UniProtKB/Swiss-Prot annotation:
Keyword Protein transport recorded: no
Its job: Binds directly to 23S rRNA. The L1 stalk is quite mobile in the ribosome, and is involved in E site tRNA release. Protein L1 is also a translational repressor protein, it controls the translation of the L11 operon by binding to its mRNA.
Record keyword RNA-binding present: yes
Quaternary structure and partners: Part of the 50S ribosomal subunit.
Family designation: Belongs to the universal ribosomal protein uL1 family.
Alphabetical list of Gene3D superfamilies matching this protein: 3.30.190.20, 3.40.50.790
Cellular compartments per GO CC: cytosolic large ribosomal subunit
Keyword annotations: Repressor, Ribonucleoprotein, Ribosomal protein, RNA-binding, rRNA-binding, Translation regulation, tRNA-binding
Protein name from the UniProt record: Large ribosomal subunit protein uL1
Alphabetized GO MF terms: rRNA binding; structural constituent of ribosome; tRNA binding
Amino acid sequence: MAKLGKRTRAAREAVAGKSDLTVEEAVALIKANATSKFDETVEIAMCLGVDPRHADQMVRGVVSLPNGTGKTVRVAVFARGPKAEEAQAAGADIVGAEDLMETIQSGKIEFDRCIATPDMMPIVGRLGKILGPRNLMPNPKVGTVTMDVKAAVEAAKGGEVQFKAEKAGVVHAGVGKASFDEAKLVENVRAFVDAVSKAKPSGAKGSYMKKIALSSTMGPGVTVAVDSATGN
């Protein structure tokens, strides 16, 4: 087994034995241990009491974090005519129709969010096996299949975060950068947790939020008391 670097070892020792912290305590600890040369992303992982293999237990949604993500989001838009022009004016990075489909089919995926007007879905539908596993498939439930292209592009660029439960019932996302003020990270964490709480599906039984953890890109994770994150 490879030896741990001094920085990694120190970070792990700093969080050893610490669990069920308040959001404020966890954020302070994460920031203190984010010592890489780049601005690490602060990430949240939530273990939910759901089985997303069942349709009535799927957790999916979108939330606009009050302080943004600190990430530059690249947006692709499937649109034609005036709507394509609207997307470009709103700041979309890539705009197209069949040409964009062919680019994606060739394996070139240079975007973080994909938006489409409803009339484009027959084309976009052919890309399901490529975009679906990457959580990039446009979906009306999260506002990425829409005629209001301008609003969708601006939301994506402005700190909107999509979330979806994975097979094990885990939802994860970036909620800011380690360089953010502690108060701003705390706000973002609580906004994300609140959105996941409101997305509780009808088929969820028993305890819904089982565990919440925060970490930075290169740092160890710490568990957060669910009550602290939800404000209960």
